[in-house]
Amino acid sequence: TPNKQPAHELPHLPRALNFYADYSGCGHWRMIWPELLLNCFGKANVQGGTVMIGDKNFYKGIETIRIQRQATEQQLNYIKWLKNVQAEKDFNFRIVYEIDDLIFREDIPDYNKFKFAFEDPKIRQTSMEIMQLCDEVSVTNEYMRNYYIEKTGNKNITVIPNFIPRFWMDRFFDLDKIKENFQRFKRKPRIVYCGSGAHFDIENRIKQKDDFFHVNEVIRKTVDKFQW
């Protein structure tokens, strides 16, 4: 009998796992949206979640395990266990540590409302050790790449910028609307800051000397010229 060929030959897709640290901005920009788009466009088979699975058979066929901002002792033990699994002959995955912010206490500004999460010296120690254990670290820009090379000694650090998903922003582009807005507001252009409240001294810890301190006077002087 002739060899039976499958009706549809599926292409080989790289398999990967994402372990999230959060489901908010960082989680979406760096993990969830890229995972969604890679799956939707058939570029890879990526699964994501927060449960660290202890059955090593689950990791067979996986090419990359990407962990986001892991820093606790339990998470360190999990990475050590993964490194032991990685060394076995049936496994060929790489472990990538994803970080898009500073997590070492000495470099986090005092006005940052979320600094308390990294005050414990154990957090610094465990996050440092995890980054040193990982095969690669991914960051958002060249500054952070150089920063973490200096801090951790891990030189295999890759810059992956943040990209806005087209399904979110692309449909809002309207050239006629842009021209209309320009004509309407050109006498007093609008300047908008879009970002986290962590850049502001919300709790007045250091008398408002935050990321906007150096431009406050400019804003005061130009409040009639620009709509801030």
Regions found by a protein language model. Name each.
Residues 64-65, 85-108:
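Active-site proximal beta-strand in glycosyltransferases
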Residues 77-79, 107-118, 198-213:
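Short, flexible/disordered intra-domain loops and linkers
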Residues 22-37, 162-228:
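Conserved catalytic-core segment of nucleotide-activated headgroup transferases in glycan assembly
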Residues 1-75, 217:
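N-terminal pre-catalytic "stem/leader" segment of glycosyltransferase-like enzymes
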Residues 132-149, 153-175, 190, 194:
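Donor nucleotide-sugar binding/catalytic pocket of nucleotide-sugar-dependent glycosyltransferases
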Residues 13-15, 93, 187-191:
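Nucleotide donor/acceptor-binding cores
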Residues 84, 116-137:
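Membrane-proximal helix-turn-helix segments that form the acceptor-binding/catalytic region
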Residues 97-124, 167, 172, 176, ...:
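Acceptor-binding helix/loop patch of EC 2.4 sugar-transfer enzymes
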